[in-house]
From Swiss-Prot:
This is Rho guanine nucleotide exchange factor 3. Disulfide bonds: none annotated. Acts as a guanine nucleotide exchange factor (GEF) for RhoA and RhoB GTPases. It is found in: Cytoplasm. It comes from Pongo abelii. Residues 122-304 form the DH domain. Gene3D superfamilies: Dbl homology (DH) domain, Pleckstrin-homology domain (PH domain)/Phosphotyrosine-binding domain (PTB). InterPro entries: DBL_dom_sf (IPR035899), DH_dom (IPR000219), Endocytic_GEF_Adapter (IPR051480), GDS_CDC24_CS (IPR001331), PH-like_dom_sf (IPR011993), PH_domain (IPR001849), PH_RhoGEF3_XPLN (IPR044129), SOS1_NGEF_PH (IPR055251). One of its GO terms (molecular function) is guanyl-nucleotide exchange factor activity. Residues 291-449 form the PH domain. GO terms for cellular component: cytosol. Residues 20-40, 464-526 are annotated as: Disordered. The modification Phosphoserine is found at S47, S70.
Length: 526
């Protein structure tokens, strides 16, 4: 889901590689020299969100994680590009269209480079990368409309209403970026160098506030697109496009996600320009102002996107009985994390961690829409007990303590429990790996700590979910003193979870009432 911190990316020129072919039995032929490898520019990188570690991060990094999760869904819904299609025939595969990566020093007069310092050349490269990225973005947005939207509308593959939902306000973004590209070209000197970009950015960046509606729509757009892929005509059309050279092996959602991906890169791009700008350059002050502007816009869009995603999933909760409804769900504006789970009986569940309540559901189809039917009563976070289970403590089938299955330990389990009077629940959850298990543990602990602190209880949670009093240093369990004392009869549901997009944004709740989590669709037939 996430990886390491990623420094500012500048495309690099790849060296030619020669291939030595073994001699053939026929007439000898010179081995052909392959063409240069080409590197996809910044706009082709799926998301810097994939390059951020699961630790405390800056608001900007948390936002990129949030948006990435907002459009990350089950891989099962994606077409298998390697699978043979009935209409494929045995024709020679068409060559994939690639976009050349360009450097400023390779594009303009080399003599100019010799007159500039190394620092200034790096500054020009960063400015050129900004400009080239705008050009690539505009080209891709126009391609999405021309190659996907318009043909599907003309061929009645989707209705106009469905296409409007999926493409959102994409059309309105094109003129914004055309304006910036035009201004950047206007200030470029005949020799290719650019002296000042700060004033242009300060004047242009505020228009990116219009991204809020586009980004807020992405969760619903992705859900509808995944649903429409079940239609044979839609799947066939998208597969043909994917295998066509113009797509560069990118599917439709890759194109629709490019604006969001570009948005979260602006602070990095501007910081790189600023890093190579001398202190006495008038551009420095303007660049610092521009960075503050874009970070404010990113934070605001982060908030609105989080609220939109939270609303989306709340609207798709199905209650089996009136008693399952909880005011904590209705009042939630933050979805910390959610993911598909599987219990030790093989039952798939989908768990949502809102800011103050944990909701366990089963994914079902209702009126041709993916919905989430509540599986048990919602669990208030403040009363939730969390336990990190050692490998081997849970066995498929429900047995506990040192159990084994086929001589292999059952790994990556943790348990959430709740007891309030006559009501009690115990759920043993299994993550798909150690990394995702730790993400869930961190997120639940952070959510619980935030709720308890908001209630006026100072302290922190230890690794076992116990609340530590900072004054006495003593451990105070919220609820029963030991999880083993809880009722584990018919209220137990041992779950296993696929949490490749679990959110670590719970810390964000301490600073704002909004946050988003990951989104991943799951289907469960129980």
């Amino acid at each position: 889901m996430v990886a390491k911190d990623y420094p500012f990316y500048l495309t690099v020129k790849r060296a030619n590689c020669s291939l030595e072919l073994p001699p053939a039995s026929g007439p000898a032929k010179d081995a052909e020299e392959p063409s240069n490898k080409r590197v996809k520019p910044l706009s082709r990188v799926t998301s810097l969100a994939n390059l951020i570690p699961p630790v405390k991060a800056t608001p900007l990094k948390r936002f990129s994680q949030t948006l990435q999760r907002s459009i990350s869904f089950r891989s099962e819904s994606r077409p298998d590009i390697l699978a043979p299609r009935p209409w494929s025939r045995n024709a020679a595969p068409s060559s994939t269209k690639r976009r050349d990566s360009k450097l400023w020093s390779e594009t303009f007069d080399v003599c100019v480079n010799q007159m500039l310092t190394s620092k200034e050349i790096k500054r020009q490269e960063a400015i050129f990368e900004l400009s080239q990225g705008e050009e690539d973005l505009i080209e891709d947005l126009k391609l999405a409309k021309k190659a996907y939207h318009d043909p599907m509308l003309k061929l009645s593959i989707m209705t106009e209403q469905e296409l409007n939902q999926i493409f959102g306000t994409l059309d309105s973004l094109i003129p914004l970026h055309e304006e910036l590209l035009s201004q950047l070209r206007d200030v470029r000197k005949p020799d290719g160098s650019t002296e000042h970009v700060g004033p242009i950015l300060v004047g242009w960046l505020p228009c990116l506030s219009s991204y809020d509606s586009y980004c807020s729509n992405q969760v619903a757009a992705k859900a509808l697109l995944d649903h429409k892929k079940q239609d044979h005509r839609v799947q066939d059309f998208l597969q043909r496009c994917l295998e066509s050279p113009f797509s560069r092996k990118l599917d439709l959602w890759n194109f629709l996600d490019i604006p969001r991906s570009r948005l979260v890169k602006y602070p990095l791009l501007l910081r790189e320009i600023l890093r190579h700008t001398p202190n006495d350059n008038p551009d420095q002050q303007h660049l610092e102002e521009a960075i503050n502007i874009i970070q404010g816009i990113v934070a605001e869009i982060n908030t609105k996107t989080g609220e939109s995603e939270c609303r989306y999933y709340k609207e798709r909760l199905l209650y089996l009985e009136e008693g399952q409804k909880d005011s904590l769900i209705d009042s939630s504006r933050v979805l910390c994390c959610h993911g598909e789970l599987r219990n030790n009986r093989g039952v798939k569940l989908h768990v949502f961690l809102f800011q103050e309540v944990l909701v366990i559901t089963r994914a079902v189809t209702h009126n041709e829409q993916l919905c989430y039917q509540l599986y048990r009563q919602p669990i208030p976070v403040k009363d939730l007990l969390l336990e990190d289970l050692q490998d081997g403590e849970v066995r498929l089938g429900g047995s506990l303590r040192g159990a084994f299955s086929n001589n292999e330990r059952i790994k990556n389990f943790f348990r959430v429990s709740f007891k309030n009077g006559s009501q009690s629940q115990t759920h043993s959850l299994q993550a798909n790996d150690t990394f995702n298990k730790q993400q869930w543990l961190n997120c639940i602990r952070q959510a619980k700590e935030t709720v308890l602190c908001a209630a006026g209880q100072a302290g922190v949670l230890d690794s076992e979910g116990s609340f530590l009093n900072p004054t006495t240093g003593s451990r105070e369990l919220q609820g029963e003193t030991k999880l083993e004392q809880m009722d584990q009869s018919d209220s137990e549901s041992d779950c296993s979870m696929d949490t490749s997009e679990v959110s670590l944004d719970c810390e964000r709740m301490e600073q704002t009432d909004s946050s988003c989590g990951n989104s991943r669709h799951g289907e469960s037939n129980v």
